[in-house]
Structures are given as C-alpha cells and as structure tokens.
C-alpha cells in the first residue's frame, strides 16, 4: 500500500472515494457526510488530500518505504513525481485503498483531518492509521501554527485519535466558523 499526498493523477479515484463514503454512511448509520466527486477533486487539486493505493507486486513493501510525507519529500520523491507525471499515472493497475482530506477554519487557525475512508477490502490492515499519520503531517506542513482536530463518530477513529495524541473537546471549543 502506497500512502501519499494526492495530486492531479489521482482525480480518477474521486467516484470510487464517494461511493465508499456513501456505502459506509449506509452501513454505519451515523451521519457520515457524503461528498461529491467535485468536492473530492477540489481537495486533491488544492494539495489538501491523502490517498492510499494498493499497487500489485509491491505488497511486500514496508510501510515506511511506501509512504511519502511532505516534509520527507526531498529530491528522491521529486524525481519520482516528475517521472510519474511524464508517464501519466504511476501504475495503471493501482487500486484505491483509502483517502482523507483537510479543512481549515478560523483564518487557518483550526484544521480538521476529515473524510477518512478505507475501502472495505483493505480494512483491518493498518491503512487507516497510515492515512491518518500522513494527513496529520500534511496538516502540520500546510498549517504549522493551527490547532488540528478530528471529528468522528466511529470508535476505531476515536481510538486512533487517542493514540495520535488528540484529546476530546466539546465541539463549541473548536471554532466559531459556521
């Protein structure tokens, strides 16, 4: 599984992402906010999204080798990205495994890690944790002074939030934006 900041080459997964969010909202019955493909594309184009992709023949790649954080980018990643852009997509047979994006409020003083979703067939493999970690790194990279939060109704994400050092706070303390 490769977890990376989403870019233009990942726009093609917007429909899959929306379908997975919709299916999960029906299954969980907890009011997961559905998103449109246009909204997902907007987040991807703005550099405010993280995507996980399953890449055949790379299943044995260690998580650290397969993940690329913004602050770890260096020239190795830049040259890899340039090659991928020149060749179109990195792998034509890669498969959507998960996604998350960030939102900012209060003059960029508050940043939410939102929309965390993992495709059914990749659940229970640690994909959500890798996405969550990359989303946090991206949030800190883009908004270094912001308070980062994660709103969730799911027990698994609550547990992850605790492990990442998030603390529970009332919604009224987060931001005054509508």
Predicted feature locations:
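Intrinsically disordered, low-complexity terminal tails and inter-domain linkers enriched
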Residues: 56-93
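Conserved acetyl-CoA-binding loop-helix of GNAT-fold acetyltransferases
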Residues: 118, 124-139
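Extended, composition-driven regions rather than compact fold-specific motifs
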Residues: 156-159, 178
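Conserved active-site tyrosine of GNAT-family acetyltransferases
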Residues: 161-163
């Amino acid at each position: 599984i490769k977890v990376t900041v989403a870019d233009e080459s990942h726009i093609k997964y917007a429909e899959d992402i929306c379908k997975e969010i919709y299916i999960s909202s029906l299954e969980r019955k907890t009011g997961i906010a559905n998103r449109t493909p246009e909204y997902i594309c907007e987040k991807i184009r703005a550099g405010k999204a993280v995507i996980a992709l399953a890449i055949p023949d790379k299943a044995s790649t260690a998580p650290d080798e397969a993940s690329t954080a913004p602050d770890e980018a260096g020239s190795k990643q830049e040259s890899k990205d340039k090659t991928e852009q020149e060749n179109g997509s990195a792998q034509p047979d890669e498969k959507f495994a998960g996604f998350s994006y960030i939102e900012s409020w209060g003059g960029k003083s508050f940043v939410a890690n939102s929309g965390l979703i993992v495709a059914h067939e990749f659940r229970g493999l640690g994909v959500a944790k890798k996405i969550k970690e990359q989303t946090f790194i991206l949030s800190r990279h883009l908004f270094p002074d912001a308070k980062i939060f994660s709103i969730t109704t799911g027990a698994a994400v609550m547990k992850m939030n605790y492990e990442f050092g998030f603390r529970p706070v009332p919604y009224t303390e987060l931001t005054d934006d509508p």
